[in-house]
Amino acid sequence: MSTSETNNIKAPNHVTEYDSVTNNIVVAALYKFTRFADFEEYREPILNIMLDNEVKGTLLIASEGINGTISGTRQGIDNVLEYLRSIDAIGSFTFKESYTDAQPFYRTKVKLKKEIVTMGVENIDPLQSVGRYVKPSDWNALISDPDVILIDTRNDYEVKIGTFQNAVNPNTETFREFPEYVAKELDPAKHKKVAMFCTGGIRCEKSTAFMREQGFEEVYHLEGGILKYLEEVPASDSMWEGDCFVFDNRVSVNHNLEKGSYEQCFACRMPITQAEMQSPAYIKGESCPHCIDKATDEQKARFREREHQMQLAQKRGEAHIGSDVIDVIEKRKAAKIEARRQADEANKAKAD
């Protein structure tokens, strides 16, 4: 997704489309780098508009912009996006949609951050310098060039379940490790053409800006990220292999942007296959083959209790959500009760 402003485009026929009966949950991924000096003042208003419209997910806001993924009904998502556009510092922005039959988030969060995507390097500004955007329709030709080194900027656990043909995996656990990878493994004199990609485009805004600052001149990145590529490029023409990891309860999406074949270990958050779920090391909510030997007994006990609470909530037909949202909901309920009480007293006073 570039910082240029365009409207969302209807998905091609090969992608699962919105259906008011079945695929009736809209999942909207968005970001925008912008000068957002008074961002702290908008945390509560944004959270309230999300709660009012029963929209779930997480939005990060910082002085450098906004980033996140939200989900809800068609009307709910439209209302939240309309409000975000009404904020002067944000204005118009591009976003990507996919559709599912179940709410992929449990919680509603708006977080104040130092960065909307954390690289941990001072003074990296995508509004000043960024790589060259490459549209999905032109991506295959670029990455087929033997002079181009193709780098997946995502974390190792994301790369392992799907990536582009011939892409380099930096083997990072977090995006903060990417600058160190560049310093150790890449050289502007040797790597003349560098192409980069990530899930939705935001990490590449930072990584290409960083690369240019390090002296790499010919740096490209996939506009709109993997999700836009999967949306626009038919599977028959695709150079993508596997699923794409997403940061919600779907865990991954396939080439049609439908829920993929992976589940997630709620203890370590790693994506796991159906085969791994048959392993003796897999205990739902507690451990999997990736973390069975890493968690302490205390951690496992905490994971068991969390799973127990989630099961109880599910039986009650409720979502097991965090205390931050519960606090906000309770405060708003209390405020409404107090407002009604004051209105009743005012009406009684008039009657007297």
UniProtKB/Swiss-Prot annotation:
Query: Is Oxidoreductase there in the keyword field?
Result: yes
Query: Which CDD domains does the entry mention?
Result: RHOD_YceA
Rhodanese domain boundaries: 144-238
Q: Name one Pfam family in it.
A: Rhodanese
TM ranges are none
According to its UniProt entry, one GO biological process term is:
tRNA modification
Record's catalysed reaction(s): uridine(34) in tRNA + AH2 + O2 = 5-hydroxyuridine(34) in tRNA + A + H2O
Q: Which InterPro entries match?
A: Rhodanese-like_dom, Rhodanese-like_dom_sf, TrhO, TRHO_N
Supply one GO molecular-function term: oxidoreductase activity, acting on paired donors, with incorporation or reduction of molecular oxygen
SMART domains xrefs: RHOD
Q: Report the EC number(s), separated by commas if there are several.
A: 1.14.-.-
Q: What NCBIfam families does the record point to?
A: PRK00142.1-4
What protein family is recorded?
Belongs to the TrhO family.
Physiological role:
Catalyzes oxygen-dependent 5-hydroxyuridine (ho5U) modification at position 34 in tRNAs.
Q: Which named protein is this? A: tRNA uridine(34) hydroxylase
Organism per entry = Psychrobacter arcticus (strain DSM 17307 / VKM B-2377 / 273-4)
